[in-house]
Amino acid sequence: MIRTMLQGKLHRVKVTHADLHYEGSCAIDQDFLDAAGILENEAIDIWNVTNGKRFSTYAIAAERGSRIISVNGAAAHCASVGDIVIIASFVNMPDEEARTWRPNVAYFEGDNEMKRTAKAIPVQVA
């Protein structure tokens, strides 16, 4: 059996740009991509914490150290500058591998300041 697992996640990054007329994609600081193990041109899901919208696009690399999160093209209808979003990528793998798999997670605060990275997501009770 093949399972689809969380590969990498940027947790609570802030949208810095939204360009409706750009070709598409989401430009992400290369340091952030590296931290989450997301590759340029990889499919990503974006979950907008601010407005509840969920959408898919692909990642492109923004300048390393820029802290840019730029939602482009039609996806710009789903996010505005200042919105808090979660960006995730997924990977398919055999069941045996999936049982021990740990995703790459980067946590952010403020103006896209990376606070820490982890290989697990802690259980939280609401």
From Swiss-Prot:
Keyword Ribosomal protein among UniProt keywords: no
Keyword hit for Cytoplasm: yes
Record PTM: Is synthesized initially as an inactive proenzyme, which is activated by self-cleavage at a specific serine bond to produce a beta-subunit with a hydroxyl group at its C-terminus and an alpha-subunit with a pyruvoyl group at its N-terminus.
Cofactor: pyruvate
GO cellular component, one term: cytosol
Compartmental location: Cytoplasm
Physiological role: Catalyzes the pyruvoyl-dependent decarboxylation of aspartate to produce beta-alanine.
HAMAP family, alphabetized: PanD (MF_00446)
Protein name: Aspartate 1-decarboxylase
